[in-house]
Curated annotation (Swiss-Prot):
Keywords: Nucleus
A Pfam family hit: MBD_C
Protein name, as recorded: Methyl-CpG-binding domain protein 3-like 2
Tissue specificity comment: Detected at low levels in several somatic tissues. Highly expressed in the ovarian teratocarcinoma cell line PA-1.
Amino acid sequence: MGEPAFTSFPSLPVLGKLKRNMMPWALQKKREIHMAKAHRRRAARSALPMRLTSCIFRRPVTRIRSHPDNQVRRRKGDEHLEKPQQLCAYRRLQALQPCSSQGEGSSPLHLESVLSILAPGTAGESLDRAGAERVRSPLEPTPGRFPAVAGGPTPGMGCQLPPPLSGQLVTPADIRRQARRVKKARERLAKALQADRLARRAEMLTGG
């Protein structure tokens, strides 16, 4: 018996080179349009980013826009503020303010309580000293304090500040002495910078 004759088959293509898309053309076109629309929707979405604060809950960031037609989300207590501020700090400053916004001076008890908060232990002494100086020279301006304006109290100007804790007044001689020190320090700094610049230039010339 003779050997069976083998028939030659054409070589099969390599599977790794087959990159034919099995999706119909119409379905592929519809899928591309849907993906483009979804991408545009994600880009146009005005979702505010989330900010991690000291609070355990995530809060959205409020966007501040300068355009008058844009509406900015705000709380009910922020409607009287001219610009974004911290409400707690704003109320704290209002509580410590010795004079009201209408220019009316506060009562001595309230002023004493404010001074006791600002400088504990010196409130009574500063009040007694201010009263004695007012009786002694009512029109003479006191160093370190605002002069009183004739014609009524001025908002924020008729309140006398407590004396510094150190009790040392700054004189014109002190100012001139400090100015001389600053001038000498600047001259030394300029000389040091000039010497460093010359040294670097010499090093570059010798190295080149």
